């Protein structure tokens, strides 16, 4: 079978495609090496919720997907991601590296997984990736001072920032007399 083209942004330091696919299935088990990674596992569960029912647990080896804190001897945010037909292992020295690995994994998923109630089979190409941020500051500015952005729109922007591993959010909230966040305790801020 032909290997699926793999596109990840930003381009990883090293990406090697391998033969095979990891097939997502109900009952998928997400294991973590440390309790501090449970929020990351829950974030991954949220990403996968339209495709599979999964569980997350500490020390969950063997696991279909395993998130592991380990000394990668890399800089902050560095990670290794290995996808085979049998399992997925993400390793990083810190939490931000694990989140970056999850963001990469999300990019490897078929786009259809982002839609609700998928009954189709989904798979992830087998790859080996090593990556680290090349810039300490990868950000975006949202200028909300000229028109109102509702909560869901802002959350979507933040979600897209996470997908592309942007790590700084500048929220331009006010210009001169304009104030764009409703604070119930101070209603005059948005009334004038």
Residue ranges, per PLM feature:
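The substrate-binding groove and active-site-proximal loops of carbohydrate-active enzymes
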Residues: 92, 138-151, 192
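A conserved hydrophobic secondary-structure block that centers on an alpha-helix together
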Residues: 143-176, 183
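Acidic, contiguous N-terminal accessory segments
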Residues: 1-138
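Long, contiguous hydrophobic alpha-helical segments, chiefly transmembrane helices and signal peptides
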Residues: 137, 142, 173, 186-189
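Single-residue recognition of alpha-helix capping/boundary positions
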Residues: 36-40, 153, 185
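Loop/helix-junction capping segments adjacent to catalytic residues or to phosphate/diphosphate-binding pockets
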Residues: 38, 99, 148-151, 180
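Aromatic- and acidic-residue-enriched carbohydrate-binding clefts of CAZyme catalytic domains
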Residues: 177-192
């Amino acid at each position: 079978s032909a290997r699926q083209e793999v596109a990840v942004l930003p381009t990883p330091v090293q990406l090697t495609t391998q033969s095979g696919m990891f097939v997502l299935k109900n009952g998928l088990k997400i294991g973590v090496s440390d309790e501090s990674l449970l929020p990351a596992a829950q974030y991954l569960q949220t990403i996968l919720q339209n495709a599979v029912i999964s569980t997350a647990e500490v020390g969950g080896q063997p696991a279909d997907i395993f998130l592991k804190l380990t000394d990668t001897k890399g800089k902050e945010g560095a990670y290794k991601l290995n996808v085979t037909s049998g399992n997925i292992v993400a390793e990083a020295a810190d939490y931000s590296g694990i989140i970056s690995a999850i963001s990469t994994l999300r990019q490897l998923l078929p786009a259809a997984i982002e839609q609700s109630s998928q009954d189709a089979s989904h798979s992830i190409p087998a790859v080996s990736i090593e990556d680290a941020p090349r810039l300490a500051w990868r950000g975006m500015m949202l200028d909300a001072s000229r028109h109102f952005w509702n909560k869901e729109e802002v959350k979507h922007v933040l979600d897209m920032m996470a997908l592309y591993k942007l790590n700084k959010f500048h929220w331009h909230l006010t210009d001169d007399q304009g104030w764009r966040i409703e604070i119930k305790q101070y209603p005059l801020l948005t009334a004038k």
